[in-house]
Amino acid sequence: MTEQYDILIVGGGNAGVSLAAALRRKRQGRVAIADGHQLHRYRPMLNYAAGGQADMARFERPMRAVIPDGVEWIPDHVVAVDAEERTAVTSTGLTVGFRHLVLCPGLTPWWGAIDGLREAYAAGWAASAHVPEHVDAARALLSRVAAGDRVVANVPAEPSSCGGTVLKALFLACAAWERTGILP
């Protein structure tokens, strides 16, 4: 084992970074965030970027820049946890010890869960405001909608991660279509 932490946070998204900052302010010991992404995106803005209300690049920072002072960054993904031994193993084989573990790794799209989903995205007639890599495609798709076109918004069943945010993207798109005369 190379490192030992009082608190290991798996995930460097908004939740992980915010928690790490709060723990450091409260002087809760040695804190680390394990996240292999090199880029941090402020995800609440994804809907606005997809809806043409914001430029996503304004809400992206190098991961190192958002790690709070005094918090260590392990630039790797955790792939296994041994609760009894209080250790985590990263994708490169690094073993990290911890007293307390916080899991907030975020979500990873499961493209194979729906037959044809990958093909729909590749063809350009499906999009998501919740997958950062597809925000620009979502914006382009929504901008091509013309009067009389049909738009289908999929709202996930609860419990889901921020299920209502799908409606926010839809309302932003409707507002844009209303401004341009596509919607009466």
Segments (PLM) and residue ranges:
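Beta1-alpha1 glycine-rich phosphate/pyrophosphate-binding loop at the start
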Residues: 2-72, 159-184
